[in-house]
Amino acid sequence: MALTLEELVKRFGGEIAGDAQCKVGGLAPLDQAGPQQLAFLANPKYLSQVESTRAGAVLIAPKDLEKLGAAAAGRNFIVTPNPYAYFARVAQMFIDLATPPRAAGVHPSATIDPAATVAATAVIGPHVTIEAGAVIEDGVQLDANVFVGRGTTIGAGSHFYPNASVYHGCKIGPRAIVHAGAVIGSDGFGFAPDFVGDGDARTGSWVKIPQVGGVTIGPDVEIGANTTIDRGAMADTVIEECVKIDNQVQIGHNCRIGAYTVIAGSAGIAGSTTIGRHCMIGGAAGIAGHVTLGDYVIITAKSGVSKSLPKAGIYTSAFPAVDHGEWNKSAALVRNLDKLRERIKALEAALAAQGGTHA
């Protein structure tokens, strides 16, 4: 379905520069878009691509349109302060228009306990299991093989993709998106040591600590494929409003993730850690347990966080990739730092004995 720029602006705002009746039926990158497609410029370093694009129209910020000057002549634009966010909303609209809603109802192969409550507007797919006391609210879509444990509530408009699981006693807020294979509410990693003796004479075992808390997830949260969020030991693990979590992220028991925080793939957050609002956690970052990150903290990819970081800012501990030979030289220097330090101390002592000075 194609829409005019005028129709888009009525829905999403912005101002038109060019032909308001230009029709677009999809989106594409600047260097690939055709006359029936809408492109966007989010990074001014690609401004030259706007001059050469074949796109029917371009989403652009006011300052970037000014930079184009005469090159903007004969082209069509929707001018908006945030072209990237505008693009995201238009993309979702086109997806919604192209995807007919699934009919409400329960697939014959689904297993629903008689003591569960399922809204008439919910879509329950093949082989879904819903245990006693669970509540599935209006407009929820549960795809094939989803498991919902006893006493769990799935908020209105949420969508669970195939093979996602949410254990018992969890609360999922409205409009959650939970991707395939994600697990919410599995046991936290809690074991009490019960050992006697030392060395080879040591006897005993680890005693499992029952995890009697749950998981509470706020509105508009998205959870990536194969991500795991452990239930609390006593109180709930909490994911606040509008948190976005990528694939294969591990969140330990009793964590609290503040609203609007984003966490990239393969990050690991150990138990009882609190992350503030509007934080950004890079891919494969590791955060130790029982620490607190303040609001607006950014942790770069592969960084390790071992202590609390209460102040907003960018933190990194990762070593960026370099040429292999250069890395080997650096590693050799690191291995010899203790020896070099001792040599420097010896030289300083010798200078001092001779009456010399050193910085």
Swiss-Prot record:
Entry's Gene Ontology molecular function annotations: N-acyltransferase activity
Reaction(s) this enzyme catalyzes, per UniProt: a UDP-3-O-[(3R)-3-hydroxyacyl]-alpha-D-glucosamine + a (3R)-hydroxyacyl-[ACP] = a UDP-2-N,3-O-bis[(3R)-3-hydroxyacyl]-alpha-D-glucosamine + holo-[ACP] + H(+)
Pfam families: Hexapep, Hexapep_2, LpxD
Protein name per the record: UDP-3-O-acylglucosamine N-acyltransferase
A GO-annotated cellular component: membrane
Signal peptide (UniProt feature, chain positions): none
CDD domains: LbH_LpxD
Family: Belongs to the transferase hexapeptide repeat family. LpxD subfamily.
Pathway terms, separated by semicolons: Bacterial outer membrane biogenesis; LPS lipid A biosynthesis
Active site per the UniProt annotation: 253 (proton acceptor)
Role, per record: Catalyzes the N-acylation of UDP-3-O-acylglucosamine using 3-hydroxyacyl-ACP as the acyl donor. Is involved in the biosynthesis of lipid A, a phosphorylated glycolipid that anchors the lipopolysaccharide to the outer membrane of the cell.
Keyword Amino-acid biosynthesis: no
EC number, UniProt record: 2.3.1.191
SUPFAM superfamilies, per database record: Trimeric LpxA-like enzymes (SSF51161)
Keywords: Acyltransferase, Lipid A biosynthesis, Lipid biosynthesis, Lipid metabolism, Repeat, Transferase
Alphabetized PROSITE patterns for the sequence: HEXAPEP_TRANSFERASES
GO terms (BP aspect): lipid A biosynthetic process
Gene source species: Burkholderia cenocepacia (strain ATCC BAA-245 / DSM 16553 / LMG 16656 / NCTC 13227 / J2315 / CF5610)
Top-level EC class as recorded in UniProt: transferase
Subunit structure: Homotrimer.
InterPro entries assigned to the protein according to its UniProt record, in alphabetical order: Hexapep (IPR001451), Hexapep_transf_CS (IPR018357), LpxD (IPR007691), Trimer_LpxA-like_sf (IPR011004), UDP_GlcNAc_AcTrfase_non-rep (IPR020573)
Domain of life: Bacteria
